[in-house]
Every structure is written in C-alpha cells, then in structure tokens.
C-alpha cells in the first residue's frame, strides 16, 4: 500500500467514526434551567410600538444562579409591570436572616426584563448613571438612596435587563450597592448574546 492511500484511508476512517460518535442529544436547544419553585406564567403584554419581551427571569434564571448571588430560590416570586407601551417581566427573591428572634428579609433581588432600551435608561437617569461593563456587556449602574436600592441595567435583545438589589436598613448594615456588580455578573450569562 502506498503512503498516499494509507493517509486517505486514515482520514476517511477518522471522519466516519467522528460522525458516528455524535450523540442525538447534542442538539442546539439548551436545557431549561433547574427551578424548584413554579411561578405563574408571565402576563399578556400589550407593548404598542415595541417588541415583546422573550426573556423571562422567573423561568430563565436557575436556582443555582440565585443561590450563588446570595438569595433564596425558594422565595421566587413573579414581579411584573405591564403598561400599554412597555412592559417589565420580572422575578423577585429574598435573603432572610434571623433578626431579634424573627426570620425577616434583609435583602431583595429583583430581576426585570424590559423592552425599554439601555439608551432610554441612560436618558432617564442622566448624570446619576455610570457606564460600566458586565462580563463585557454594555450596562449602566445607578442608585436610589431614599429607596435603599441599587440598579444595574444591561443591554439585551429584548431591550434591557434591570437588576435591582434592595436592603431593609433596620435589619442589615449592608448597603444596596455593596454586591450588585457580582450579582449582575452571575446573571449576565443567562441572557445569551446581545
């Protein structure tokens, strides 16, 4: 056998076994995230003049991500706002601690997918917004000290994702913005590409 024929047979043999070893389960459809608490479906959107929101944080952010962010996935609760011209499809999670003998929420995480764009948030927040990147994704951060809340808004295919951390001042010394960049960094990979 000539060396050229041997190489051709070797290449053919490799490529056919490569094809045979591909499993049918290796499809491009991602598995849904693991979520232990079911929530009602997202409400109907009206969105006159805007696209519908496809990313639902209540069904697309896994219990693992919520736990890694420091919140209790068993407190998963729908938190939506539907208006005629825009929508927020959201989910809320608590972190509870025993304070003075009572188990109370000391921190809350709210994740809202909206068809309001990042540019619209920039205009609305003006000079109080700071440009940042979350895992390379365009975003802004701002806070509302009077509401004990901090926000990161990231650009998405739907418009933007609003990540809000809030604290209950009487029950914790933590500030709302203390860990929000880490929290947003954990949530960002669930969005796919923007």
Residue ranges and their predicted role:
Residues 1-5:
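N-terminal export and membrane-targeting signals
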Residues 9-13:
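C-terminal motif of bacterial Sec signal peptides marking the signal peptidase cleavage site
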Residues 15-18:
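Bacterial signal peptide processing site
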Residues 21-26, 30, 155-157, 169-170:
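N-terminal accessory/precursor segments of enzymes
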Residues 22-96:
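Extracytoplasmic low-complexity, Pro/Thr/Ser/Ala/Gly-rich segments
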Residues 46, 51, 123-194:
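A short, solvent-exposed beta-edge/loop patch
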Residues 64-70, 98-102, 158-159, 184-187:
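Extracellular/mature segments of secreted proteins
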Residues 68, 72-135:
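Short, solvent-exposed recognition patches
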């Amino acid at each position: 056998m000539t060396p050229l024929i041997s190489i051709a047979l070797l290449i053919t043999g490799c490529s056919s076994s490569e094809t045979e070893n591909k499993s049918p389960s290796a499809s491009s459809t991602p598995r849904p995230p693991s979520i232990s608490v079911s929530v009602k479906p997202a409400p109907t959107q009206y969105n006159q003049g805007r696209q519908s929101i496809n990313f639902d944080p209540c069904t697309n952010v896994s219990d693992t991500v919520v736990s890694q962010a420091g919140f209790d996935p068993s407190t998963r609760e729908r938190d939506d706002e539907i208006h005629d011209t825009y929508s927020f499809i959201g989910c809320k999670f608590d972190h509870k601690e025993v304070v003075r003998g009572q188990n109370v929420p000391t921190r809350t995480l709210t994740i809202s997918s909206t068809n309001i764009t990042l540019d619209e948030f920039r205009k609305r927040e003006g000079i109080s917004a700071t440009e940042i990147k979350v895992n390379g994704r365009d975003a802004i951060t701002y806070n509302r000290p009077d509401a004990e809340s901090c926000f990161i808004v990231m650009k998405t295919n739907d418009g933007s994702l609003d990540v809000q951390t809030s604290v209950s001042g009487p029950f914790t010394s933590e500030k709302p913005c203390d860990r929000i960049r880490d929290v947003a960094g954990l949530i960002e990979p669930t969005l796919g590409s923007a």
